[in-house]
C-alpha cells in the first residue's frame, strides 16, 4: 500500500464558490484517471502557474505533493502537477460530469446559476485567455483597438453549451472557431467586459490567476471611458496591498 495523504474528500459534495472554481479548473486543466495497477482512481490537475495549483491544494486541504516537470503540451515550459488519489473525489467528480479521456467529448455541466461565475472563472484560469488587439497611429503611437476573451476546449459541444449558459447572463452568442487541435469560443470587447464583471464580482484577491485579471485592469486604465461603477468597485476590491 502507498502512503495515504490527507485531503478533504467531501469537497465536491456541496456547491460553494471555491468548489465551483476548482470544478471549472479541472474541466479545463484536469483529468480523471483509473489505473488499477498503479494508483487506482485519482485526479490530476496541471498548470504552468504554481500559485494556482497551491491555491487549489489549499482549498482541498490536501497534503499531496506538487510535482514540477517539463510538459510537451506547454511547449517545454515548466508545469506543476497535483495528483490526488481518492476514490471518493473521483466518484463525486464523475457525478458532476467528468470522466477519463474527456477532452474531445466533455459537455458543459449543470452549474447552479449562483455559482456560474465561479465555475467560469476557474475554467478561464485553466483554459481561457484575454488579449489586446493593438495598432499604431499616424504618429507611431500605440493604440489599443479592443480586447478579446477566448475559451478553449477540445469539445465543441462544451463550448456551445457554455455560450448558451453565458447568454443567460446577458452575453451574445459567442463565435466558435477551430484552431489547430482545439475549438475556441471568442467574445468581443463588450462581452469581455461582461465576463469580467461575472467572474470577478464578489471575489477575494486570492481566488483567481492574478495575471489574467491584470490584463483586464490594464485595459480599463487605457480606456477609462468604459469603466462603470461595478468595474470601479471590482478594481478597488482587488488592489494588492
Model segments located where?
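Internal intein/HINT superfamily modules and their associated LAGLIDADG
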Residues: 1-241
Amino acid at each position: 500500500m502507498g502512503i495515504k495523504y490527507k485531503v478533504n474528500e467531501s469537497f465536491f459534495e456541496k456547491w460553494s464558490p471555491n468548489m465551483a472554481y476548482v470544478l471549472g479548473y479541472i474541466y479545463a486543466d484536469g483529468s480523471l484517471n483509473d489505473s488499477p495497477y498503479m494508483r487506482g482512481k485519482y485526479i490530476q490537475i496541471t498548470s504552468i502557474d504554481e500559485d494556482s495549483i497551491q491555491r487549489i491544494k489549499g482549498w482541498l486541504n490536501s497534503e499531496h505533493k506538487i510535482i514540477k516537470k517539463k510538459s510537451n503540451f506547454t511547449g517545454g515550459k515548466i508545469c506543476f502537477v497535483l495528483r490526488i488519489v481518492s476514490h471518493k473525489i473521483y466518484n463525486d467528480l464523475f457525478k458532476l460530469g467528468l470522466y477519463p479521456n474527456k477532452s474531445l467529448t466533455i459537455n458543459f455541466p449543470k452549474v447552479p446559476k449562483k455559482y456560474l461565475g465561479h465555475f467560469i472563472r476557474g475554467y478561464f484560469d485553466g483554459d481561457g485567455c484575454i488579449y489586446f488587439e493593438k495598432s499604431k497611429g499616424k504618429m507611431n503611437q500605440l493604440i489599443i483597438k479592443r480586447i478579446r476573451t477566448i475559451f478553449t476546449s477540445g469539445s465543441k459541444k462544451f463550448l456551445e453549451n457554455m455560450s448558451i449558459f453565458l447568454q443567460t447572463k446577458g452575453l451574445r452568442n459567442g463565435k466558435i472557431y477551430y484552431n489547430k487541435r482545439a475549438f475556441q469560443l471568442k467574445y468581443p470587447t463588450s462581452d469581455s467586459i461582461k465576463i469580467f464583471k461575472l467572474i470577478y464580482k464578489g471575489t477575494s484577491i486570492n481566488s483567481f490567476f492574478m495575471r489574467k485579471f491584470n490584463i483586464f485592469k490594464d485595459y480599463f486604465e487605457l480606456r477609462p471611458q468604459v469603466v462603470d461603477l461595478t468595474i470601479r468597485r471590482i478594481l478597488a476590491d482587488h488592489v494588492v496591498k
